[in-house]
Amino acid sequence: MQIRRSEKWVWQNRTAEREENDLGLQDDRMSGNIQDIARLITRLLLKGDMPQYTLPAAEADYTEADQLFKKVIGLADEGDINGAENELLMNMKEDDPDYLELALTFYLHLNDMDVDYLDDHDYSREEILDGLKSLAEDWGVTGLEALV
């Protein structure tokens, strides 16, 4: 009887390991989908490969967009991811490609975060993907649901 319990315990552990591995693969796929969507939006609207919003070396040279980028990245890194996204959405300037690249870079920054960090701060890869889709729609790119 003890052998069966032991076998059952081993089987349950292996099942848990498989489930954990499946979740890891699912997260990897979702992360890859996010990168692909960001790349597609960038190619369609910014004529580049991947968004790479960068800040000037001197803070005195910051534009409004630069200040927003620094703020939202800082908030996200401090764990206020939802607050960072709200700040981004409230301060986006329509039809300004700098703000589009800023937002795309922001979502890719979130995508680079560990899934546990995202979970701990009430955020998910699905929300990142939803944010990218919404951003794309605001810029006239529709039909991304079919890709994911």
Q: Predicted regions: what is each one?
A:
Residues 27, 104-148:
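Amphipathic alpha-helical binding modules
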Residues 9-11:
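Tryptophan (W) side chains
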Residues 45-65, 90-120:
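Short, charge-rich amphipathic alpha-helical segments embedded
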